Amino acid sequence: MHLQALTGLATLAVTAASQTLWSRDVDYKALSKELSASAKVYFPGTEDFDAASKRWSNLDKPTVNIVAVPATENDVVEITLDLTQANTLRQVKFANKKNLPFLAQNSAHGAITTLGQMKQGIEIYLNQLSGVKIAKDGKSVTILGGTASKKVTMGLWEAGKQTVTGCCECVGYVGPALGGGHGWLQGRHGLIADQFESMNIVLANGTLATVDENSELWWALKGAGHNFGIVTSVTSKTYDAKIKNWAFASLTFKGEKVEELYETINKYILKNGTQPTDLINWSYWFNIPDLDPTGPIVQILLMQEGVDVVDKAYTGPFQELKPLAVDAKKGVYTDLAKWVGVTTEDGPCQKNGAMNPRFPIYLQDYNPAAQKKAFNYFADNIRGDSIFNGSLVTFDGYSTEGVKAIDSKSTAFAYRNQNILVGPLLSYQSNGTATDEKASEIGHKVRDILHEGTGRDTVPVYVNYAFGDEGPKEWYGSEAWRQSRLQELKEAYDPKGMFSFYAPIA
């Protein structure tokens, strides 16, 4: 799905009982001596440790012996980049010397099962590496590695600026960008990663490097960046916020209309991959018992830039299908997250102990028959008192003009030609392995049905939503040249595979 508060990769907690699993030959407290006075180290059994290592999804979570927190000055003071990045650097060196696994964590919303391969290691918690500094000429912004998307959005907005960020407020800015990164403004400017001008990154050898378009690593960092280091800051393009107003419309239908609804989206919204730049279309499948107690509904969401009411050319065809409920709002760009339910206060941003595996797939357009088949299967498994009744399927239909304007070979992100990002999300409180296996079965089946409807051989997967069993060809593109280039760069920059817990290249 979508999500903010910091940035990097991911990690999690261990209980008091797991303290017995610690490597007895490692003096973890020695790490404190390696850091500045304002840095922090958290140990199991403390509230700080529990809070810092808590995850959005508890399925196949990593286990952590210690949490190290790089220091910064407080958020209202200009952050000294050299100091904060040096702290991260020392932690990497400590882990290297002790031969310990480590993960950098942002908001901990990564749900990929490969994270569970991180055992008894160090979490580098980036929440203090948070800050936004706009350049004097207003054309770029430097963002520290642990900065939340909301902080970036609001900091720029107050200065009359914008850049492409993730949609969900509780997700970090950098983390999604390392996998490409979708956002509201991508129709105008491209992916989040397309905004990068340079970045500072701690590499596997413990050195801090400044990387830009002149580095061979630049290509890989924009799409497969989780595999190459810890980003401590990034400088990105900014744009004047010339158009401030947005309009929103939601139309909710009984599931029996699913086939007609997606035919309508194909005809009036997608338009064979030419969706208007100022228009965004999402849709959800989920339970709203007050509207339909018999099963999940289909909710169509339309967001349009530069108007106070969504054009009837887009809402009219849906109105003709007689929705159960309709809502309309007007506001500004910063209202979008609230309208679609992904603010820091909304459900997708809460860490409540649930399992939240996702099973993403990209689509060119909708196969209405496949949509109906997938919906019916999903509905049969989440309706009523099912343990999975809090699950949903999301369909993100951003404008893609800005994404497609960039050469597909210029970055490691492989799916610029795709128009729809689908994110089946099985959300539940696990009561055992059998339940986890059933959730996996449901999620995979929904994806399989949609994939069969495309007639394609390969399954294109958004790496930031990945379940974990797909593989490099699905995450990073099946072309042989892409796989070869990534493997060569991995061998050159991380031959020991130190950054291989999130969707590893090899």
UniProtKB/Swiss-Prot annotation:
Molecular function terms from GO: FAD binding; oxidoreductase activity
InterPro entries, alphabetized: BBE (IPR012951), FAD-bd_PCMH (IPR016166), FAD-bd_PCMH-like_sf (IPR036318), FAD-bd_PCMH_sub2 (IPR016169), FAD-linked_Oxidoreductase (IPR050416), Oxid_FAD_bind_N (IPR006094)
EC category name: oxidoreductase
Keywords: FAD, Flavoprotein, Glycoprotein, Oxidoreductase, Signal
Listed EC numbers: 1.-.-.-
Sugar-bearing residue positions: N205, N272, N281, N389, N431
Pathway entry: Pigment biosynthesis
Needed cofactors: FAD
Domain FAD-binding PCMH-type stretches: 59-241
PANTHER family assigned to the protein according to its UniProt record, in alphabetical order: BINDING OXIDOREDUCTASE, PUTATIVE (AFU_ORTHOLOGUE AFUA_1G17690)-RELATED, FAD-BINDING PCMH-TYPE DOMAIN-CONTAINING PROTEIN-RELATED
Family: Belongs to the oxygen-dependent FAD-linked oxidoreductase family.
Name of this chain's protein: FAD-linked oxidoreductase chry5
